[in-house]
């Protein structure tokens, strides 16, 4: 294999219709070379349609798609400089790992010996050197996934597309393989567009996350940006659970905001806060509970569940039920206990109205 040639991706005002249904209304986005960008969202948000448009498996109703600065809008899939790792891996069960990786090369016109050499190099890249003789059935789910990645990479695409690549793995293996994918992408420096509905997966592997909703972009940013500075209540709750309550921003300067919640003032990170009515997103682990209510932000324990290293509470308040995670397992609060709710310094985000 020669050096990886990471390419950029650009969607310019792309609309995709299926009959009378508009799946993507005027979508514009960019992916910088050498980055891993995740399209994240609920089912039906448009992320898979976006990936299929990029792969050439669908064509836009209007707009332009560019890969590496080249307009590929009307090019068929086989003429685009991309490779795709499918959800099912799509390995041939009767072929060895080496033969699976070499197959695409031979189909692209490489001589058999050269294809095998490049396939062996590809398997080494993904940590499967010496395992080329094994059939897919003789490999673990994670190893099969790496064979699929190797098969895509040996074609030296400008962009690697990954469509829900971990969905067929169990939870423990998912964590390990997502780490391997991220390490491989950072080591080789290829551009990747990754589709998933799993927020933890997106947070773990991405340089940039694009959260999609109803065919548009709800928010784009780094994993930290989306988690710590959500642009809306939807993003706050989608990127890890959040309790959203009304508040008033009294002032915001020098990176700190003074807010009023339930009659009490608090100081929290300002980020992009503007004075006036707002909402406060509260992560479940961003508060402490004290077993005595005394005005201010308080509530009553409506439900509790012991989960080993933490206790989950539902606290009934004037703003509805709050979901709270408390690591203090040694002092469980009984049901109907009145509690005061105190904010920590992290895990709070102001959402402007």
UniProtKB/Swiss-Prot annotation:
Keywords for the protein's UniProt record, in alphabetical order: ATP-binding, Cell inner membrane, Cell membrane, Ion transport, Iron, Iron transport, Membrane, Nucleotide-binding, Translocase, Transport
Catalytic activity: Fe(3+)(out) + ATP + H2O = Fe(3+)(in) + ADP + phosphate + H(+)
E.C. code: 7.2.2.7
GO cellular component terms, semicolon-separated: ATP-binding cassette (ABC) transporter complex
GO molecular function: ABC-type ferric iron transporter activity; ATP binding; ATP hydrolysis activity
Keyword Chloroplast: no
Topology in membrane: Peripheral membrane protein
Subcellular location: Cell inner membrane
Disulfide bonding pattern of the chain: none
InterPro entries: AAA+_ATPase (IPR003593), ABC_SmlMolc_Importer (IPR050093), ABC_transporter-like_ATP-bd (IPR003439), ABC_transporter-like_CS (IPR017871), Mo/tungstate-bd_C_term_dom (IPR008995), P-loop_NTPase (IPR027417), Transp-assoc_OB_typ2 (IPR013611)
Domain ABC transporter intervals: 9-239
Alphabetized PROSITE patterns for the sequence: ABC_TRANSPORTER_1, ABC_TRANSPORTER_2, FBPC
Enzyme class: translocase
Binding site for ATP: 41-48
Main location group: membrane
Quaternary structure and interacting proteins, as annotated: The complex is composed of two ATP-binding proteins (FbpC), two transmembrane proteins (FbpB) and a solute-binding protein (FbpA).
PANTHER family named among the record's database cross-references: SPERMIDINE/PUTRESCINE IMPORT ATP-BINDING PROTEIN POTA, THIAMINE IMPORT ATP-BINDING PROTEIN THIQ
Function: Part of the ABC transporter complex FbpABC involved in Fe(3+) ions import. Responsible for energy coupling to the transport system.
Family of this protein: Belongs to the ABC transporter superfamily. Fe(3+) ion importer (TC 3.A.1.10) family.
Name of this protein: Fe(3+) ions import ATP-binding protein FbpC
Lineage of the species this protein comes from: Bacteria, Pseudomonadati, Pseudomonadota, Alphaproteobacteria, Hyphomicrobiales
